[in-house]
């Protein structure tokens, strides 16, 4: 019995130990969470990871330059790294295969025979087509001989002329997830606040190589160089090298270099579309994009030149609107505030609450609250009361002054610069509000243009960054395709080349989905504003289209009249000749004016050619009078409304010639 008891005790002890191990709490760092859920941040696969890395680095570069009001100059380079070069970078020696059948891409003799036979048949068909003059199809890419585990590697480098980073802050800025400078309430380009940190995590997961950062701030006589990676489990930077170098060129900005696994082939078009759309929404920036391949003919170099020096204002950090806060935020604001009393807290920590309104709110909260009440003494139950009142009370809408839209001028320039449309109209709406957050919708609609397909081509921007994925469910797409009656604006939805550009800026973009790639269609305020902005552009285009149609009809009328001049001249001249003969034989009497004209016909003063000239002059005169009437109705007078000159910078250049037209005066400086 004692032995049995001992056995049972040991079994029980073992069971308790097992339960203890199973119930042991485990924690994950933020870096570990994002490493395991990388699709949330746009790192779904190697191709998407390459695209997202480029996007994060470019947006950081723009933010950095704009923060010091510097016109951005961004250089992006993607360099292809073959397997042998990558192995040498990590110190791995290439090894020949010994057991070939072990590998996923092993090809049996039977499979090889089938492949060769198929290739031979394809070659034979191509030869026959060539002999008969038929056009051959492009040969398909062979599916074989790329191992399942064989990866493609790329070195991504982004250089800017921005603010740079403080020497001591660089390790934490890149090696600690959820630490940064963009967590206040203001309009920001980033979706998660991860920036280059997620690129470093992906580099750590796919190549194991560290990230390299060079940075210098204005007036610094040194350049910081830092090579580091990240301790995923502890969420801290692992510094390999952190030093200062000379800065003889007085350069300021940052250069970031990271080696990652990627797929240029499948995401080439997405990356180039992103760069082009970024050039549309930021025409004041200059982008240089390079792709360097092991095969020189595959190299790509594209320069997106700057079109304007006008930059949007820098977004301003703002305070929370009372209707947009929740209990957690109220608790955090109370914890962080430096104000002593509840009255001061309400007045200074929220927008649209002045001293009078704060006192009224406190009076409405009940006898447990008072203006001089210590804000730090507010209990959890009292916080709930504050929250309930915030949701029920009426507040003025927040101002849109904290936002930084691209601007109608920049949007128009960007569209013209990149698409070269035949017509373009832009519109910038006033600030509106949803859930206590201000937002502004800007829109542009273009007709025609370079590399634009027939039908509706949609370009979406959120906080001045392009959105390229999950377009179908987006509020802009649904509005443009289903809620706009294009025919009523003289626009053919299927035949015309229509570009629809919509940019939404806000302190909180209501993205949908884990990847934050589209804006939902369920917020009526935004949907209404988007529809209105597109319609305003269409109204502008309609007037231009109608004027163009009228001008075309006028030209067609002139061509028609000119085409009938020879026949009309011949018929009239024959009638005049017949009248002259009748007058000579006195078979018919005519008035004095008719006799004078018939006399000129008989003396060959009026001929068929003179009639033709007079009719042509009359058509020209009528055309001129109609054009003048059309110009007057369109708001253009016969004389310039205002003389506007482009003045030479040299004051000594005083010689000029004025060239006048019905719409402007052009002064040519000599």
UniProtKB/Swiss-Prot annotation:
Any Pfam family hit: Topo-VIb_trans
Localization per Swiss-Prot or TrEMBL: Nucleus
GO molecular function annotation: ATP binding; DNA binding; DNA topoisomerase type II (double strand cut, ATP-hydrolyzing) activity; identical protein binding; protein homodimerization activity
Disruption phenotype: Plants are defective in cell elongation and show a severe dwarf phenotype.
Keywords annotated in UniProt: ATP-binding, DNA-binding, Isomerase, Nucleotide-binding, Nucleus, Topoisomerase
Chain intervals for the UniProt region annotation (Disordered): 1-30
Gene3D superfamilies from the UniProt entry: 1.10.8.50, 3.30.230.10, Histidine kinase-like ATPase, C-terminal domain (3.30.565.10)
Reactions catalysed according to its record: ATP-dependent breakage, passage and rejoining of double-stranded DNA
Entry keyword annotation includes Transit peptide: no
InterPro entries (UniProt xref): HATPase_C_sf, Ribosomal_Su5_D2-typ_SF, Ribsml_uS5_D2-typ_fold_subgr, TopoVI_B, TopoVI_B_transducer
GO BP, one annotated term: response to brassinosteroid
Biased composition (Basic and acidic residues): 7-25
Disulphide bonds in the chain: none
Expression (tissue specificity): Highly expressed in leaves, stems, flowers and seedlings.
Binding of ATP, residues: 60, 160, 181-182, 190-197, 516
PANTHER family, per database record: DNA TOPOISOMERASE 6 SUBUNIT B
Function: Component of the DNA topoisomerase VI involved in chromatin organization and progression of endoreduplication cycles. Relaxes both positive and negative superturns and exhibits a strong decatenase activity. The B subunit binds ATP. Involved in cell-elongation processes.
Record text on subunit structure and interactions: Homodimer. Heterotetramer of two TOP6A and two TOP6B subunits. Interacts with SPO11-2, but not with SPO11-1, RHL1 or BIN4.
Entry similarity comment: Belongs to the TOP6B family.
Protein name (database record): DNA topoisomerase 6 subunit B
Native source species: Arabidopsis thaliana (Mouse-ear cress)
Designated gene of the protein: TOP6B
